[in-house]
Amino acid sequence: MYRALVMFPKSADPMEVDALIEGIASSFKASARSQPITRSVGSLMGPGAKAGEAGWILEANFSTLEDAMTALHAEDFQDPKARTEALGSTIFLFEVQEL
């Protein structure tokens, strides 16, 4: 399984982040067989939140690398991706396994 993780900066406008999250989720659902797509709600907690860098997190799971790459290269993802990166967000893609 593969996971896309997007960390939006705390300094970003909340309404803009909400719109981007909706756009990314819609794109991922339309372009690939994405599994659950989740987002953080409320304030981030834990040691990493103390640094204050990230304010919101989006996660999307994909069964295969091909599905993930299809989603990340989809035409309707390119605008939300560019806007997300312009905010200073960080986008990760990585393989995961259950322990």
What are these model-predicted stretches?
Residues 1-70, 94-99:
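Short S/T/G/P-rich N-terminal loop/turn motif that feeds into the first structured element of a domain
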